[in-house]
């Protein structure tokens, strides 16, 4: 019989019961963990069938890996090192024991990939599959990053190609056979990787003034990073400087490409600002530590976002994905 007792046994079978930092193990009313940090970083995220993923084109392992990766991306945006997560599962009637076994194989894989540990969670029945995660990290050293701390003339950077995931999702929705370049774009959507190492590295640098992860689209998250218009800050980004994969740029018209890159979302790249006077040293440090970063614009005092494309300046609306209820 598939019930919560079965799931608890499944979790205990696949995950070690106790560690030196996790004395209670899975199965108690709550988890007790030991940490060396005086600052914990905590975030939560939900992945909902029909909203964030579709069972028609996701395997159970992929669902598990993606759900944890996108949650950990929020910790990376704060410069934190991920340590633990808990997961509440809401399970519909069409999910069977084989599916759950594969799902927890995915959780085991993602734990190994990020060197993190599952603390436990909760289960309940539902009309659709929902994974509700809480992720816990710790501050490395004394420094962490927040949004809104950028200053006028700071330079704006991203950590990788923008728009690939959005294009990959579009391909998934409209095709059933894929070329190799299309498979690479689809992978960006289905299997994003949190920028953990880069986030920790940037978190320790005083010259990095603010940071966010790109979840809902470059333009929308840039607006969140810069802050409300009432604050007087604005930003200008240059289209030609935004990193885009060849697979992406060759497959879309100019208008569709702009929408995918600026408003698509699901990139889970880091978007951050660096002090104007320190960019040369910053870029040297990144190169020395084998981190690729891309300068795409600067903070100004115009009170709005703007885009430079082909030498022409236009207003950039902070549009992207927003949950509507």
Predicted feature residues:
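Helix-biased detector of long, well-ordered alpha-helical tracts
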Residues: 1-325
């Amino acid at each position: 019989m598939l019930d919560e007792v079965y799931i608890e046994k499944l979790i205990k079978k696949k995950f070690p019961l106790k560690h030196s930092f996790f004395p209670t193990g899975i199965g108690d009313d709550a988890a007790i963990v030991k940490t060396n940090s005086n600052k914990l970083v905590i975030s939560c995220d939900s992945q909902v069938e029909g909203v964030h993923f579709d069972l028609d084109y996701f395997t159970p392992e992929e669902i598990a890996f993606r759900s944890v990766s996108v949650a950990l991306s929020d910790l990376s945006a704060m410069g934190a090192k991920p340590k633990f997560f808990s997961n509440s599962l809401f399970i519909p009637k069409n999910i069977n024991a084989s599916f759950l076994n594969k799902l927890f194989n995915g959780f085991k894989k993602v734990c190994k990939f990020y060197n993190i540990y599952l603390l436990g969670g909760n289960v309940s029945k539902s009309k659709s599959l929902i994974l509700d995660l809480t992720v816990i990290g710790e501050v490395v050293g004394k420094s962490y990053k927040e949004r809104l701390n950028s200053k006028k003339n700071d330079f704006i950077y991203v950590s990788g190609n923008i728009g690939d995931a959005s294009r990959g999702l579009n391909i998934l929705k409209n095709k059933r056979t894929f070329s190799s370049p299309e498979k690479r774009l689809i992978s960006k959507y289905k299997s994003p990787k949190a920028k953990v190492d880069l986030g920790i590295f940037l978190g320790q640098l005083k010259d990095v003034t603010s940071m966010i992860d790109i979840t809902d689209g470059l333009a929308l998250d840039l607006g969140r990073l810069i802050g409300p218009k009432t604050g007087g800050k604005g930003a200008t980004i240059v289209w030609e400087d935004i990193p885009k994969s060849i697979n992406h740029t060759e497959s879309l018209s100019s208008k569709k490409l702009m929408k995918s890159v600026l408003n698509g979302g699901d990139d889970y790249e880091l978007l951050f600002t660096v002090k104007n006077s320190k960019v040369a040293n910053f870029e040297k440090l990144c190169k020395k530590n084998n981190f690729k970063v891309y300068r795409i614009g600067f903070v100004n005092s115009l009170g709005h976002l703007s885009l430079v494309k082909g030498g022409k300046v236009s207003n950039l609306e902070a549009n992207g994905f927003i949950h509507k209820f």
